[in-house]
Amino acid sequence: ARKARIKEMMAEVLLPTDDEYLERYPHQLSGGQQQRVGLAMAFACRPSVIVLDEPTTGLDVSTQEHVLKTIRQLTRDHGVAALYITHDLAVIADLADDVAVMYSGRVVEQGEVSEIFKNPAHTETRHLVAAAPDIASKKSIVGLAGRAQSPGKRPVGCAFA
């Protein structure tokens, strides 16, 4: 039953299910294959919520799209809610319904993705949106000035006030 479940999950993330492939070590897999094995492991437990911390970091654009498509399909097929932790606004715009923007360990703005990106209310959100590359426009990318606050030296209240 265990081996059958492993093969079932590997097939769901579009990886080979033959015994030779299942015997491979992580270093014998590409980054995208490693991500999909991680997804198979996570969904094998039949969770109601899955936390994805930077699920596409270090992947090329085509592999990134394939991994995100796989995540989208798995969450729909299994009725699983997904919590994405990412700095990649393109991922959020593509996959999320709602977003919470954090700064220095605190949620500074939250709401529907379309509204937050169209009308960002908080300074940090405006900075993030302005810093995101936009292939459709010719605007220059705006860098984020400064450094993140150290956890033990966070200001009281809003750092932007």
Q: Predicted segments — roles?
A:
Residues 19-20, 112-161:
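Short catalytic/signature loops enriched in Gly
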Residues 3-20, 129-130:
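Conserved ABC ATPase "signature" region
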Residues 98, 110:
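Short, glycine/charged-rich "phosphate-handling" switch motifs in NTP-dependent
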Residues 92-94:
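A short, surface-exposed alpha-helical micro-motif characterized by mixed small hydrophobic
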Residues 25-29, 33:
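Conserved ABC ATPase signature
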